[in-house]
Amino acid sequence: MDEPSTDKILIGAQIITTVITLFTGVFEFIIAAKSKMKRMKSEQMFSVNQDGLIHIIKSLLPGRNIIFISNAPTSTTDPSFNSQTMKNFLKVIFRLLPFFIGAVFIHLNIIPFHHLIIFTENGKWYFDSIQEELIPIVKERLKQIMSSQPDVIFACGAVVRDIFYMYLEEGSIEMFEINGNLKVDINKFKKIYTTVSDKNISPQSNEILDLFEFDTTKSSYEDVIEEYSKFENDSLGSFENPDYSGFHLLSKRKWNNKEALIVGIGKSNNKTTVQIKGDLLDKGYFRTELAIDTYFDRNKVLINKMVKNFKSTQEIIKPSPVISGNWSLDEQKALMVEVSTLGNKSEINWFFISKQLFLKGISRNARECQRKHESIQYVGLSGNPKGKFKRTFD
């Protein structure tokens, strides 16, 4: 028998095995649900959770340690079994469906085990491959974060990739469902690895100027880091590629015992200090509120103009380049801005690209930028553009 025929037989056998496993898992799921209903009948309480689908997925991936991390509810409880309870039940199943699909794909060897991550972003599903060479880099960084034993690690969008790497061990698989609409109680965090959006935590604009300044005329990373290290509580990070000497460094500060991130965005009279104020949502880069204009005196007119032209019904406005009159293209990075809305909340997203990429034109989607341009200098909590730059947050 020739090799292609053998492959077809193997694929067919895998499909048959998968179908049998699925039917068995679904049958066991139904039996378990009925049993649970009987047990809880006296309490007049019907509870639905993810146990059934997790059981099916574990059946598809025997011997593998499966951990589910979701910031969306994966269970529902109702005083009685009614139509609303069934709707909630279906919602739970729908939320877990990406996990199920991924398990099937791995079981059929459609997607390599170590190359799978599944998460949702604004209701859309993404299948994202992982570059193997990045795994040890990001794993090490995340291990340093975890060594501080934070109470909560909150991640959305592209940041999920980093956390996925950290848990990536032989014989284990991590899957995530991420909902960008998650509202976070900031007081539940022991440490916050993002900027802060709570007005009670953020400093006033005049406080920012006292926190962080560095001379952007320094010629090398070593010089910048030396000056940068003069400030307490800074997280300097680790820089692998000296060619990024013009990249703006990140700093952490503590306000009211909470940590936040500061980003220098260029220079005015050789020194600039700007805090980007925002919360980590679904894009993997900084989401900043419209109130940010109070921190950008030089760009205030421009931002107010953008806000005035912004329509709340628009999901995303195409980004516009922002270059201060005091900045020269030879000296500065280009700053891209886009305005978006999440529910009834309007936000401005800031991120940086190199002058060269700016002049060539670049996609407005930061994730696409990371994929298409190896050299992009991209400011976002997920951090490293294609692994060429990394930092720690411990």
Curated annotation (Swiss-Prot):
Q: Does the keyword Cell wall biogenesis/degradation apply?
A: no
Domain Myb-like stretches: 325-377
Q: Sorted alphabetically, which keywords does the UniProt record give?
A: Membrane, Transmembrane, Transmembrane helix
Which positions, given as ranges, span the membrane? 11-31, 99-119
Membrane topology field: Multi-pass membrane protein
- Subcellular location, principal: membrane
Top-down, what is the taxonomic lineage of the species of origin? Eukaryota, Amoebozoa, Evosea, Eumycetozoa, Dictyostelia
- Entry's localization field: Membrane
Q: InterPro entries this protein is in?
A: Homeodomain-like_sf (IPR009057), SANT/Myb (IPR001005)
- Identify one Gene Ontology CC term for this UniProt entry: membrane
Output this protein's name.
Answer: Myb-like protein R
Q: Which gene encodes it?
A: mybR
Which SUPFAM superfamilies does the UniProt entry name for this protein? Answer: Homeodomain-like (SSF46689)
